[in-house]
Amino acid sequence: MKMTFNITYIIIFISVFSCNQQKIKPQAQLFSQDYLELKKENKLEIIDLDSVHNYKNLISRMSKIACKDKLSGLKISFKDTIYNIIGYTNCPEDNTIGCYFRRNFITIQNDSLILERSNKGRKEPIGYLKTMIDSIISKPHNYIFNEDKLKPALIQFNVEEKYPINTTKKVLREIATRFQAVVKTDNPDFFSYSILFVNYDISKIPPPPPPK
């Protein structure tokens, strides 16, 4: 009787253990464009955003990486997905000015898209990004001349110090997800993008003067 009880207990334990094992699924991996290639070439230094307190702390670490002539590989774990995103920023010791012509510009301050700064600082929540991307895709002048490929997007991004790191994570997940959704199987560079992390309030910068 005692032996029967022990055997039953073992069977129940094994069954429960097996069920728990079946519930554990490996997290999916989402990689931004060129991430794996740059990692293979040892041009990335990984930052797990779970180890970062806020945006100020993040951009400080990214700047140190930039001064080593490397890019930041940003890792975000959320639910069943690990997001692997390339982040760009400037090295404080480098006075070189970046040249960003022929781009589709997207500006994000905190968790809001800054639209038409000339229009009294009009903003939309980050969830509006899909609509913005669809609008860019629909306009022929946003494409590279004579190619089925959009001009690359330059996303200028800043988050105020008062916001938690979860704000940064949310925005980066949205960017990665929305751009991944428009990638074509036969044209992976259809709409490439770069995220430029800056340390100033983008929404307060006046727009460029209109052409004469």
Which role fits each region the language model picked out?
Residues 3-10:
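Sec-dependent signal peptide recognition
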Residues 15-18:
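C-terminal motif of bacterial Sec signal peptides marking the signal peptidase cleavage site
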Residues 20-212:
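Long, low-hydrophobicity, acidic/polar, solvent-exposed interaction domains
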